[in-house]
């Protein structure tokens, strides 16, 4: 495919789940921020694994065990190359972004945060990037601080500089907000954190599916993301950590494979990355994630970004034209492919239920971001999000459904 374009109709053919009707209408799936759909190419490698070489890894010398080990470790190398990490030891497979962040909070955080230290986050964070740091602050009697947001839900460089100081030990921030679509300047925030001797842990769950990642350029100390948001299987995530940090960290789960030697009363740990992967790992899921990465790379992230930006701007303009809709977050040209909104006098769950009758799937609720909902002065919102298999036809279907919803709820019975 061309570097800056792709045929969306050909892409759609790869996703069998999209070839169905919901409530008698064509499915317009606009909820990829929660979970993306999975192409046949990924489904095929999963089937191939279970049919041909399903076995445990690292332990067996038989053929199936060797094939499974090769597939699993090749997946690690695919991820390493995808994010431009220096070393394969820097790639830890986890259950997802939440597990990755918790690993950092418990292992690095417990060892390095002391009473009186500060942990810096923002109010736009997903609960998975607030609650682990809340709990760490409580365990250590440290202070949790929040970088203020602008009226558009973005971060101002001066506010960042004023919040991060020499007491800061950890800065935890989303690369892209799962609610507002705000894209944060991780490289600049990392520079500020490092100037004060702090480390930065990035929630990349919403960024990895949509943009090319470069750990050398970004200089994040830890970076977490999930497979199920980027065309891969559920139950698989990645923690990138700088090797020199991971080497000093203690595991937080114990069992098979992560050990070097076990005696009756003591144990030593395996080398990286195995010491953080206790038990039977997520073999099929890792192999599926690697295929999802290859699928996205074949399309090209420049093309993905360009296409998603066009969809987002189109949707933003069409939705803005509906009287009574309030859209939250940055302007249309400074946001990722997510639009969070409310329809005047209609509860978001009613909006989501109503548009579902027209075949449109959107998310409704607090989106695991209750502090952000409080900041927005709402209890919940509706959210539409876009990916490589969406089209303007999907957006038009949403717009028509929203207009019908508005008309229905404005009718006086």
Curated annotation (Swiss-Prot):
GO molecular function: cysteine desulfurase activity; pyridoxal phosphate binding
Similarity field: Belongs to the class-V pyridoxal-phosphate-dependent aminotransferase family. Csd subfamily.
Entry's EC annotation: 2.8.1.7
Cross-referenced PANTHER family: CYSTEINE DESULFURASE (PTHR43586), CYSTEINE DESULFURASE 1, CHLOROPLASTIC (PTHR43586:SF8)
InterPro entries referenced in this protein's UniProt entry, alphabetically: Aminotrans_V_dom, Cys_dSase_SufS, Cysteine_dSase, PyrdxlP-dep_Trfase, PyrdxlP-dep_Trfase_major, PyrdxlP-dep_Trfase_small
Catalytic residues as annotated in Swiss-Prot or TrEMBL: 368 (cysteine persulfide intermediate)
GO biological process: cysteine metabolic process
Transmembrane portions of the chain: none
Enzyme class at the top of the EC tree: transferase
N6-(pyridoxal phosphate)lysine modified-residue sites: 229
SUPFAM superfamilies the UniProt entry points to: PLP-dependent transferases (SSF53383)
Cofactor(s) named in the record: pyridoxal 5'-phosphate
Entry function: Catalyzes the removal of elemental sulfur and selenium atoms from L-cysteine, L-cystine, L-selenocysteine, and L-selenocystine to produce L-alanine.
Keyword Transferase listed: yes
Species per Swiss-Prot/TrEMBL record: Staphylococcus aureus (strain Mu50 / ATCC 700699)
Swiss-Prot/TrEMBL keywords: Pyridoxal phosphate, Transferase
Name of protein: Probable cysteine desulfurase
Reactions catalysed, as given in the entry: (sulfur carrier)-H + L-cysteine = (sulfur carrier)-SH + L-alanine
Cytoplasm as UniProt keyword: no
């Amino acid at each position: 495919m061309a570097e800056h374009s792709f045929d969306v109709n050909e892409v759609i053919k790869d996703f069998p789940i999209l070839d169905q009707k919901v409530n008698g209408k064509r499915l317009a799936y606009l909820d990829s921020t929660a979970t993306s759909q999975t192409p046949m190419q990924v489904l095929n490698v999963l089937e191939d694994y279970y049919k041909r070489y399903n076995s445990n890894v690292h332990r067996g010398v038989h053929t199936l065990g060797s094939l499974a080990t090769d597939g699993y470790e090749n997946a690690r190398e695919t991820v390493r190359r995808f994010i431009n990490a220096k070393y394969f030891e820097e790639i830890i497979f986890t259950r997802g972004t939440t597990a990755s962040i918790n690993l950092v909070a418990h292992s690095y955080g417990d060892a390095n945060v002391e009473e009186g230290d500060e942990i810096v986050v923002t109010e736009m964070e997903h609960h998975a990037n607030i609650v682990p740091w809340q709990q760490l602050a409580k365990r250590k009697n440290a202070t949790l601080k929040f970088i203020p947001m602008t009226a558009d839900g973005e971060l101002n460089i001066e506010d960042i500089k004023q919040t991060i100081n020499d007491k800061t030990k950890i800065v935890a921030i989303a690369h892209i907000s799962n609610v507002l679509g705000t894209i944060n300047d991780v490289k600049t925030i990392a520079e500020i954190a490092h100037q004060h001797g702090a480390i930065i842990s990035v929630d990349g769950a919403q960024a990895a599916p949509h943009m090319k990642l470069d750990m050398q350029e970004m200089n994040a100390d830890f970076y977490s993301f999930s497979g199920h948001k980027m065309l891969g299987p559920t139950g698989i995530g990645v923690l990138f950590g700088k090797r020199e940090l991971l080497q000093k960290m203690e595991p937080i789960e114990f069992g098979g494979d992560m050990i070097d030697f076990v005696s009756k009363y003591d144990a030593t740990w395996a080398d990286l990355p195995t010491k953080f992967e206790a038990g039977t790992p997520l073999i099929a899921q890792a192999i599926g994630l690697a295929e999802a990465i290859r699928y996205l790379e074949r399309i090209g992230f420049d093309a993905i970004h360009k296409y998603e930006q066009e969809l987002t701007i189109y949707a933003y303009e069409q939705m803005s034209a509906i009287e009574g809709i309030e859209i939250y977050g940055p302007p249309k040209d400074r946001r990722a492919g997510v639009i969070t909104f409310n329809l005047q006098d209609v509860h978001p769950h009613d909006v989501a239920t109503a548009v579902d009758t027209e075949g449109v799937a959107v998310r409704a609720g607090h989106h695991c971001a209750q502090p952000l909902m409080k900041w927005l002065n709402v209890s919940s919102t509706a959210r539409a999000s876009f990916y490589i298999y969406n089209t303007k036809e999907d957006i038009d279907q949403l717009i028509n459904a929203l207009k019908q919803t508005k008309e229905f709820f404005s009718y006086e019975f």
